[in-house]
Regions:
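Glycine-biased, small-residue-rich flexible motifs in mid-sequence functional cores and linkers
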Residues: 1, 81-195, 199
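Short, small/acidic-rich helices and loops at N termini and domain boundaries
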Residues: 1-83
Length: 199
């Protein structure tokens, strides 16, 4: 199995939260070590319950995760994880950083400056116009515009960046294969997007 698969597997174990993964990675260096660990070794991990160990064991036998892994490749969904050259190092500075980022397109260039523009969904027309203006101007200055693709300020800023030929990326709370809100489907197809979840 490839290292990528083990990362995908550990991120898709039913009930396995970031907090539990952090406990596992305090003991194991890689997802492959978790995959191959004995029950006794798994039981030695602080705050990992028997139900978590059962979920790990079940996920090893279930080919559903492997099928999902194959499917995302066919859909053009890729992912990165800590230690990969394209994983955004700045994320490692936050306490609860994601172990996997799913994305389509390309991730931001870490050697170029970025700006985040976020705001109200229910904004005034003036606010929407100013957000689009900022997006256009920042893109014109070579800044990468990062936002959330929500209605209102987020979408307006990204539309402005795209209009000016700039790079814009949406960080999604849902899977990268889901356009939410649906009214932003045109923006969704233009953007390069990333997400902590594949679906």
């Amino acid at each position: 199995m490839r290292e990528d698969y083990y990362w995908y597997w550990v991120n898709n174990i039913v009930g396995m939260s970031n907090a539990k993964l952090k406990k596992l990675f305090a003991v194991f260096d890689t997802p492959e070590e978790i995959y191959k660990a004995s029950d006794r070794l798994l039981e030695s991990v602080n705050d990992i319950r028997m139900s978590d160990i059962m979920a790990i064991k079940e996920s090893r036998k279930d080919d559903y995760i492997y099928r999902q892994y194959s499917d995302i490749e066919k859909q053009g969904i890729r992912f990165t994880y800590p230690g990969q050259i394209n994983y955004p190092d700045k994320l490692l500075n936050i306490y609860d950083y994601p172990y996997i980022l799913y994305y389509k397109g390309r991730l931001p260039d870490t050697d170029k400056p970025s700006v985040a523009i976020v705001g109200a969904r229910n904004c005034t027309e003036y606010g929407r116009m100013i957000a689009q203006h900022f997006g256009e101007n920042f893109a014109g200055m070579g800044l990468q515009v990062i936002s959330g693709m929500a209605l209102g300020i987020d979408a307006a800023a990204q539309k402005g960046a795209i209009k000016n030929g700039g790079y814009s990326l949406a960080v999604l709370g849902c899977g990268v294969d889901i356009c939410y809100p649906r009214t932003n489907i045109e923006l969704y197809t233009c953007l390069l997007y990333t997400s902590p979840s594949p679906r």
